[in-house]
Structures are given as C-alpha cells and as structure tokens.
Amino acid sequence: MKNLIGCVLCGGQSIRMGTDKGLISVEDTPWAKLSANKMEELNIPVVFSVNQNQLSNYKALFPTEQCITDHNINVEGPLKGLLSIHQEYPTLDILMMACDMIDMDKLTLSHLINIYQTEPNHDYYVYKHQDLIEPFCGIYTSGVLKNVMESIDNESFQDFSFQHILAIGNTKTIIITDNAPFKNYNKVSDIGY
C-alpha cells in the first residue's frame, strides 16, 4: 500500500507479563512477528517500535532498518513509539498494532483499511467497543501526527493519552462486531496455550 506503513508496538515495559511480550513465541514465532505477518499479508511494509533496552534482542530477529527506537520526544508510553515511527516516516500514514494482538485477523484489518481508503477525510481510523476506543489497531494519518508533534514541541499539549487524542481529533470509529481479534495478553494467566 503506497502511503501506509505498519508499526508493531513492542516498546512497553510488559511488567504484568514479566517478560518482553513481543519476544514470547507461539510455535517458534515471536508475537511481534505474528502481528507483523498480519499486516504483511495485506502488502503493508512493517517496522517495530522498540525501546533502546530491547534493540539488540529485536535486531537478532529482524533487519536493523525495521527496528525503530524511541526518539527524544517529550512524551512517554505508546504515543512516543508512534511518534518516533512518524519521525522516521513523516509522509506515511501508520497502521499501528500492539505486539500482543496476536488474535487480530485479516478480515478486521482489511475492513479498517477499506474504510481508510474510502473515507479519506479523517485523522484517525480506530475500532470502538461500546464507549471504549481501541487505539492499538488503528490508522494514524501523517498530517495529524505532524500536528501532534508540533503541539508537544510548543508545550501546548498536556494530555498524551490515546483516548484524549482520539476524542479531540477527527476520528472515524468503527464498531467492533467480533471481540476476539482485540484480545490482548497482559499476564501469563491470559495465555491459553
């Protein structure tokens, strides 16, 4: 896809899991790769957002150019990872997935991409379950990410949560009809294999 790059967010602390979630394997395939495969099946190039402490482990599994470390941005958490990818690819829109969304399916991703392509006037494209927006399977456009970066640089931005950013933006929400693809795994007890 011409103007879209996939990003697998792997840079979290994984405190509740007790280990780097992106490196947990299912049948010898790390979760980060499982998530990437889902986007690559749709011909979307993929990069991995990692923190500096993870870089050597990820470079052992993936090409160096696909491993993007957090940039020096005055924000923390997943937004830092997303904006670091944006700084590397400032003209591309980003399809972002968390590394633990291993149940995400091609149909759900294809539906998101179809809406992104047919309704191009939005800043963000995300799924929604009742009143809760699911930010970690969403498309974030380059123009609005540039604006978010400028707001951070100008210190005019105070709430860095995805829920806030999506609430104030021109966000296209898509109602979730099947919860299974959105399961994420936060604790060892969540893993059923």
Residue positions per predicted region:
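RNase H-like, Mg2+-dependent phosphodiesterase core
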Residues: 147, 189-193
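Short, conserved phosphate/pyrophosphate- and ester-handling motifs at nucleotide-, phospho-/glycolipid
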Residues: 141, 187
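PAPS-dependent sulfotransferase catalytic core
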Residues: 184
